[in-house]
Amino acid sequence: MTSIQVNGPGDRAAARHGDPRRLRSTAFGLMMFLLVQFALGMVVNLYVRVPAGRAGYGPGWPVLVLHGLVGLALIAGSVSLAVRAVASRARQAAVPAVTAAVALLVAAAGGLRFLGTGVEGASLVMALCAAIAIGCYGLILYRLPGAGPQPGR
């Protein structure tokens, strides 16, 4: 475990509610993981036949399973980041983190709909929601200060 150096009353509040600068690394990791997920989704879209009746997924089913597992991990990570951002009371991180978590939940629902029906619009929902989440994590990286030395310290 790591500790936060507490020098004054403002630092005590940051330590109690979580330092928002620590959210940057999680947002960066989720954004990179989302790019991998996006690439897996493209492979599934191009090379895996998803039948409407679930008769069989062909030889590309391992990529489809990996895509689903990565999606579940992303949802867990995004919800964790959203909870931590809200708890840290850093509005500049909380709003995009919650938005990204909701977008990934909608993407998962689109994925389940696509598996059940084969409707192309559900695949589009997944891609657009992934893009929204990537943008939200980029916004967190832009808005939050880095972990390096801060001005005035």
Q: Which residue stretches match the model-derived regions?
A:
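Polytopic transmembrane helical bundles with strong interfacial aromatic enrichment
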Residues: 2-153
